[in-house]
Protein backbone atom coordinates (compact mmCIF):
# COMPACT_ATOMS: atom_id res chain seq x y z
CA UNK A 1 0.00 0.00 0.00
CA UNK A 2 2.71 2.50 1.00
CA UNK A 3 4.78 2.03 -2.15
CA UNK A 4 1.69 2.12 -4.35
CA UNK A 5 0.18 5.41 -3.20
CA UNK A 6 1.55 8.97 -3.46
CA UNK A 7 3.11 10.49 -0.36
CA UNK A 8 0.65 13.39 -0.54
CA UNK A 9 -2.26 10.94 -0.18
CA UNK A 10 -0.48 9.26 2.73
CA UNK A 11 0.06 12.65 4.38
CA UNK A 12 -3.64 13.45 4.13
CA UNK A 13 -4.68 9.99 5.37
CA UNK A 14 -2.34 10.35 8.33
CA UNK A 15 -3.30 13.96 9.06
CA UNK A 16 -7.04 13.26 9.01
CA UNK A 17 -7.07 9.53 9.82
CA UNK A 18 -5.02 9.32 13.01
CA UNK A 19 -7.24 11.84 14.83
CA UNK A 20 -10.29 9.76 13.84
CA UNK A 21 -8.66 6.62 15.23
CA UNK A 22 -7.67 8.43 18.43
CA UNK A 23 -11.18 9.84 18.81
CA UNK A 24 -12.59 6.32 18.43
CA UNK A 25 -10.16 5.01 21.06
CA UNK A 26 -11.18 7.86 23.37
CA UNK A 27 -14.84 6.91 23.02
CA UNK A 28 -14.34 3.14 23.15
CA UNK A 29 -11.97 2.96 26.11
CA UNK A 30 -12.81 6.17 27.95
CA UNK A 31 -9.40 7.68 27.30
CA UNK A 32 -8.80 11.39 27.57
CA UNK A 33 -6.33 12.08 24.76
CA UNK A 34 -6.46 15.66 23.56
CA UNK A 35 -6.30 15.17 19.81
CA UNK A 36 -6.04 18.90 19.14
CA UNK A 37 -2.87 19.13 21.23
CA UNK A 38 -0.97 16.90 18.80
CA UNK A 39 1.15 19.07 16.48
CA UNK A 40 0.66 18.60 12.73
CA UNK A 41 4.37 17.79 12.47
CA UNK A 42 3.76 14.50 14.32
CA UNK A 43 1.36 13.38 11.60
CA UNK A 44 3.74 14.45 8.83
CA UNK A 45 6.69 12.70 10.45
CA UNK A 46 4.58 9.56 10.86
CA UNK A 47 3.56 9.59 7.19
CA UNK A 48 7.11 10.21 5.96
CA UNK A 49 8.52 7.56 8.32
CA UNK A 50 6.15 4.85 7.14
CA UNK A 51 6.62 5.80 3.48
CA UNK A 52 10.41 5.80 3.70
CA UNK A 53 10.43 2.59 5.74
CA UNK A 54 8.60 0.85 2.91
CA UNK A 55 11.19 1.93 0.33
CA UNK A 56 14.22 1.45 2.57
CA UNK A 57 13.15 -2.02 3.64
CA UNK A 58 12.95 -3.03 -0.01
CA UNK A 59 16.45 -1.65 -0.66
CA UNK A 60 17.83 -3.51 2.36
CA UNK A 61 16.05 -6.74 1.38
CA UNK A 62 17.51 -6.54 -2.13
CA UNK A 63 20.99 -5.82 -0.75
CA UNK A 64 20.82 -8.82 1.58
CA UNK A 65 19.71 -11.06 -1.28
CA UNK A 66 22.54 -9.72 -3.44
CA UNK A 67 25.22 -11.07 -1.09
CA UNK A 68 26.98 -13.91 -2.85
CA UNK A 69 25.74 -17.33 -1.74
CA UNK A 70 29.32 -18.53 -2.16
CA UNK A 71 30.51 -16.18 0.57
CA UNK A 72 27.77 -17.37 2.90
CA UNK A 73 28.58 -21.00 2.16
CA UNK A 74 32.29 -20.37 2.72
CA UNK A 75 31.57 -18.75 6.09
CA UNK A 76 29.40 -21.69 7.14
CA UNK A 77 32.08 -24.15 6.03
CA UNK A 78 34.48 -22.34 8.36
CA UNK A 79 32.10 -23.15 11.22
CA UNK A 80 30.47 -19.76 11.67
CA UNK A 81 27.07 -19.70 13.32
CA UNK A 82 24.13 -18.01 11.59
CA UNK A 83 24.61 -14.95 13.78
CA UNK A 84 28.29 -14.76 12.89
CA UNK A 85 27.49 -15.12 9.20
CA UNK A 86 25.08 -12.20 9.44
CA UNK A 87 27.45 -10.00 11.48
CA UNK A 88 30.65 -10.74 9.55
CA UNK A 89 29.48 -11.46 5.99
CA UNK A 90 25.90 -10.54 5.15
CA UNK A 91 25.46 -7.21 6.97
CA UNK A 92 28.81 -5.66 5.90
CA UNK A 93 28.32 -6.69 2.26
CA UNK A 94 24.65 -5.65 2.23
CA UNK A 95 25.58 -2.27 3.75
CA UNK A 96 28.00 -1.61 0.88
CA UNK A 97 25.35 -2.59 -1.66
CA UNK A 98 22.46 -0.70 -0.04
CA UNK A 99 24.19 2.58 0.83
CA UNK A 100 23.80 4.33 -2.57
CA UNK A 101 20.11 3.43 -2.72
CA UNK A 102 19.48 4.50 0.87
CA UNK A 103 21.26 7.83 0.33
CA UNK A 104 19.15 8.40 -2.78
CA UNK A 105 16.01 7.65 -0.76
CA UNK A 106 17.12 10.13 1.91
CA UNK A 107 17.57 12.83 -0.74
CA UNK A 108 14.06 12.07 -2.02
CA UNK A 109 12.70 12.32 1.51
CA UNK A 110 14.38 15.69 1.99
CA UNK A 111 12.75 17.04 -1.14
CA UNK A 112 9.44 15.38 -0.28
CA UNK A 113 9.19 17.29 2.97
CA UNK A 114 7.97 20.27 0.95
CA UNK A 115 4.64 18.43 0.78
CA UNK A 116 4.25 18.82 4.54
CA UNK A 117 2.86 22.29 3.77
CA UNK A 118 -0.35 20.59 2.66
CA UNK A 119 -0.76 19.31 6.24
CA UNK A 120 -0.44 22.81 7.66
CA UNK A 121 3.25 22.69 8.53
CA UNK A 122 5.21 25.84 7.77
CA UNK A 123 8.50 24.56 6.37
CA UNK A 124 10.88 26.12 3.82
CA UNK A 125 8.48 26.00 0.88
CA UNK A 126 5.57 27.28 2.96
CA UNK A 127 7.70 30.11 4.29
CA UNK A 128 8.54 31.11 0.71
CA UNK A 129 4.85 31.14 -0.21
CA UNK A 130 3.98 33.25 2.82
CA UNK A 131 6.75 35.76 2.16
CA UNK A 132 5.96 35.78 -1.56
CA UNK A 133 2.36 36.63 -0.74
CA UNK A 134 3.51 39.58 1.33
CA UNK A 135 5.71 41.21 -1.31
CA UNK A 136 4.72 39.41 -4.56
CA UNK A 137 8.31 38.30 -5.14
CA UNK A 138 7.48 34.62 -5.58
CA UNK A 139 10.18 33.90 -8.15
CA UNK A 140 13.01 35.05 -5.88
CA UNK A 141 11.55 33.09 -2.97
CA UNK A 142 11.27 29.90 -5.01
CA UNK A 143 14.82 30.31 -6.32
CA UNK A 144 15.98 30.59 -2.69
CA UNK A 145 14.01 27.47 -1.74
CA UNK A 146 15.44 25.54 -4.67
CA UNK A 147 18.96 26.54 -3.61
CA UNK A 148 18.29 25.37 -0.04
CA UNK A 149 17.02 21.98 -1.25
CA UNK A 150 19.89 21.71 -3.73
CA UNK A 151 22.46 22.47 -0.99
CA UNK A 152 20.88 19.88 1.31
CA UNK A 153 20.94 17.33 -1.50
CA UNK A 154 24.62 18.05 -2.21
CA UNK A 155 25.46 17.68 1.50
CA UNK A 156 23.61 14.37 1.77
CA UNK A 157 25.19 13.13 -1.46
CA UNK A 158 28.67 14.11 -0.21
CA UNK A 159 28.01 12.27 3.04
CA UNK A 160 26.90 9.25 1.00
CA UNK A 161 30.08 9.32 -1.08
CA UNK A 162 32.12 9.59 2.12
CA UNK A 163 30.35 6.51 3.50
CA UNK A 164 30.82 4.62 0.23
CA UNK A 165 34.55 5.40 0.22
CA UNK A 166 34.86 4.32 3.87
CA UNK A 167 33.13 1.01 3.13
CA UNK A 168 34.79 0.35 -0.22
CA UNK A 169 36.62 -2.92 -0.44
CA UNK A 170 39.71 -2.53 -2.56
CA UNK A 171 40.55 -5.41 -4.89
CA UNK A 172 44.14 -6.62 -4.57
CA UNK A 173 46.29 -5.36 -7.45
CA UNK A 174 48.33 -8.56 -7.70
CA UNK A 175 45.40 -10.76 -8.73
CA UNK A 176 45.32 -11.63 -12.43
CA UNK A 177 41.73 -12.17 -13.60
CA UNK A 178 42.44 -12.10 -17.34
CA UNK A 179 41.79 -15.83 -17.76
CA UNK A 180 38.62 -15.90 -15.67
CA UNK A 181 35.61 -17.07 -17.62
CA UNK A 182 37.59 -19.02 -20.19
CA UNK A 183 38.57 -18.14 -23.74
CA UNK A 184 35.91 -17.41 -26.29
At which residue positions do the language-model features occur?
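Transmembrane alpha-helices and adjacent helix-loop boundaries
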Residues: 1-184
Amino acid sequence: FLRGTPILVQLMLTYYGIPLVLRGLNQEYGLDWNINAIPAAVFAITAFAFNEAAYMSESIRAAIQAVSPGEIEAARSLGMTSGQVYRRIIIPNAAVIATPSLINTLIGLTKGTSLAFSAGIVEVYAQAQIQGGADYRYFERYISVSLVYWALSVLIESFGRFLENKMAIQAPESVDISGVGGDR
